[in-house]
């Protein structure tokens, strides 16, 4: 389990959350129903900020390639993403198709 309280990358999660959501909505990749389902899933996850960990980890990976964030931030958000995925799958809230969609 990653230590959510000490994770240095969680500050960037808050900054990226709205930008990533808007980008996906503008590209037509996510409709209102998917946004609502993901929000309900993440509401049940004990994180210190309300975010989209899977999308954010992908966003961080792109930023790392551009030299904007360090590898520790990316690694921490990958741990956060894995924790979210495992908890959501274990609770039966997210099927393989939804998980695959959130990775894109």
From Swiss-Prot:
InterPro entries, A to Z: Bifun_inhib/LTP/seed_sf
Q: Which GO terms describe its molecular function?
A: chitin binding; identical protein binding
- Tell me how the protein is altered or processed after translation: Glycosylated.
Q: Name one GO cellular component term.
A: protein-containing complex
The processes (GO biological process) annotated in the record are: defense response to fungus; disruption of cellular anatomical structure in another organism; killing of cells of another organism
Which keywords, in A-to-Z order, does the entry hold?
A: Antimicrobial, Chitin-binding, Fungicide, Glycoprotein
| Domain of life, per lineage | Eukaryota
Q: Summarize the subunit comment.
A: Oligomer in an unreduced state.
| Protein name per Swiss-Prot or TrEMBL | Chitin-binding protein 2
> Native species of this protein?
Moringa oleifera
């Amino acid at each position: 389990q990653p230590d959510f309280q000490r994770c240095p990358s969680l500050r960037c999660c808050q900054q990226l959350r709205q930008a990533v959501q808007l980008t996906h909505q503008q590209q037509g990749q996510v409709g209102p129903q998917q946004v609502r389902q993901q929000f309900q899933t993440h509401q049940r996850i004990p994180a210190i900020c309300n975010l989209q960990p899977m999308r954010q980890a992908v966003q961080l990976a792109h930023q790392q390639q551009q030299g904007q964030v360090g590898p520790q931030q990316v690694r921490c958000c990958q741990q956060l993403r894995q924790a979210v995925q495992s908890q959501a799958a274990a609770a039966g809230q997210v099927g393989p198709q939804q998980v695959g969609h959130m990775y894109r």
